[in-house]
């Protein structure tokens, strides 16, 4: 079995603000988003409806970062698959600080959910690692996140791979 462990995070939530996109010296895009997830329950003692919101820092790399910057906006609902990472940094006074983030890179997935929101992408469009190419995508639709069906690839992901990305693995069984 997996003797090295598993580090996989799956979130469905709404953006708390517009994505912040930056470019690394090598030209690769990096997008930072803040994702809110909420759970609600009824208090057994009072019968009162309660809700708790958790905020998550998410970092997207490469084509996913570009797609996020172009199509996601504050309030957009999104499905994220990534890994949990904690990084260490120093503040201006030299104190060590730690930040835990969900990192979405080559093996991760970002899928836009819901309808158009002020010029966003059509409902259900997604982008996966390698710009949506070479890996199974999540099925379209509300809350169905398992299964083997593949969807057509969105037009914004048809740009050629940059030199620092591995070659694309095309599926010979194209559904269109």
Swiss-Prot record:
InterPro entries: NA-bd_OB-fold, Primosome_PriB/ssb, ssDNA-bd. GO terms for biological process: DNA recombination; DNA repair; DNA replication. PROSITE patterns: SSB. It comes from the Bacteria. Pfam families: SSB. Plays an important role in DNA replication, recombination and repair. Binds to ssDNA and to an array of partner proteins to recruit them to their sites of action during DNA metabolism. This is Single-stranded DNA-binding protein. It comes from Serratia marcescens. The gene is ssb.
């Amino acid at each position: 079995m997996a003797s090295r462990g598993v580090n996989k995070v799956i979130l469905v939530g709404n953006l708390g603000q517009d994505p912040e996109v930056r470019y690394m010296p090598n030209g690769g895009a990096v997008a930072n988003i803040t994702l809110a997830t909420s759970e609600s329950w009824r208090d057994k003692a009072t019968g009162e409806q309660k809700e708790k919101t958790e905020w998550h820092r998410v970092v997207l790399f490469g084509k996913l970062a570009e797609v996020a910057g172009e199509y996601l906006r504050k309030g957009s609902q999104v499905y994220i698959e990534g890994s949990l990472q904690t990084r260490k940094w120093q503040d201006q006074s030299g104190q060590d600080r730690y930040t835990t983030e969900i990192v979405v890179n080559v093996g991760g997935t970002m899928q836009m959910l819901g309808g158009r929101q002020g010029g966003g992408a059509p409902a259900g469009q997604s982008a996966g690692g390698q710009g949506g190419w070479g890996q199974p995508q999540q099925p379209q639709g509300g809350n169905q996140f398992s299964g083997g069906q593949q969807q057509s690839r969105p037009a914004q992901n048809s740009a050629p791979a940059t030199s620092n990305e591995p070659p694309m693995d095309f599926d010979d069984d194209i559904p269109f």
